[in-house]
UniProtKB/Swiss-Prot annotation:
Function: Part of the high-affinity ATP-driven potassium transport (or Kdp) system, which catalyzes the hydrolysis of ATP coupled with the electrogenic transport of potassium into the cytoplasm. This subunit acts as a catalytic chaperone that increases the ATP-binding affinity of the ATP-hydrolyzing subunit KdpB by the formation of a transient KdpB/KdpC/ATP ternary complex.
Domain of life (superkingdom): Bacteria
HAMAP family: KdpC
Organism: Ralstonia nicotianae (strain ATCC BAA-1114 / GMI1000) (Ralstonia solanacearum)
Name this protein carries in UniProt: Potassium-transporting ATPase KdpC subunit
Length: 204
């Protein structure tokens, strides 16, 4: 009985066609994800949220003094202090955003907290209240511009004394700069340290 011999292999696909299709897909995706999408999102952001899209820059007298999104290093007694910052070589270095990555048993973490406690007590020896934890710890980004209302309240008397201001006026200023949780549910109440310190300059 006669048998039919099958071809050893199917016809090879056209390599040039596959390469052309891959190239078209690559160029198309590059244009969409690398050009079109960023341009559209940036345009929407600038139109809907111009301040945030521009970095939430805070200005005084027409000059930028900082960003509402990035903390600054305050260590003088007449200012409210923010959280510790683990960025290097300088605190609140936006180009080196990171946490300390130190484990809870690492002596360096304990030493940093002890040093901040000592600095807080030296700046206000009469204050015997418990120190809020956010004043002796760094945030995950190292750039957190906020502290808790409790951390601000801990520093009120020191700041008022250094500026020769009534304590109640400084307390009122803290309350005015306290931001409630989003929709009253998401997050915790916070105080922006830079905005609070700028507000101190407006008190007479």
């Amino acid at each position: 009985m006669a048998t039919t011999t099958q071809p050893a292999h199917a016809e090879a696909p056209q390599q040039g066609g596959l390469l052309r299709a891959a190239l078209v897909i690559f160029v198309g995706l590059s244009l969409v994800t690398g050009v079109l999408y960023p341009v559209v999102v940036t345009g929407i952001g600038k139109a809907a949220f111009p301040a945030q899209a521009g970095g939430s820059i805070i200005e005084r007298g027409g000059k930028p003094v900082g960003s509402a999104l990035i903390g600054q290093n305050f260590s003088e007694p007449q200012y409210f202090w923010g959280r510790l910052s683990a960025t290097s070589p300088n605190p609140y270095n936006g180009a080196a955003s990171s946490g300390s990555n130190l484990g809870p048993s690492n002596p360096a973490l304990t030493d940093a907290a002890k040093a901040r406690i000592a600095a807080l007590k030296e700046a206000d020896p009469a204050n015997t209240a418990p120190i809020p934890v956010d004043l002796v710890t760094a945030s995950a980004s190292g750039l957190d511009p906020h502290i808790s209302p409790a951390a601000a309240a801990y520093q009120v008397e020191r700041v008022a004394r250094a500026r020769h201001l009534p304590v109640e006026r400084v307390k009122t200023l803290v309350a005015e700069h306290t931001t409630a949780p989003i929709l009253g549910v998401f997050g915790e109440p916070v105080v922006n340290v830079l905005e609070l310190n700028l507000g101190l300059g407006d008190l007479k």
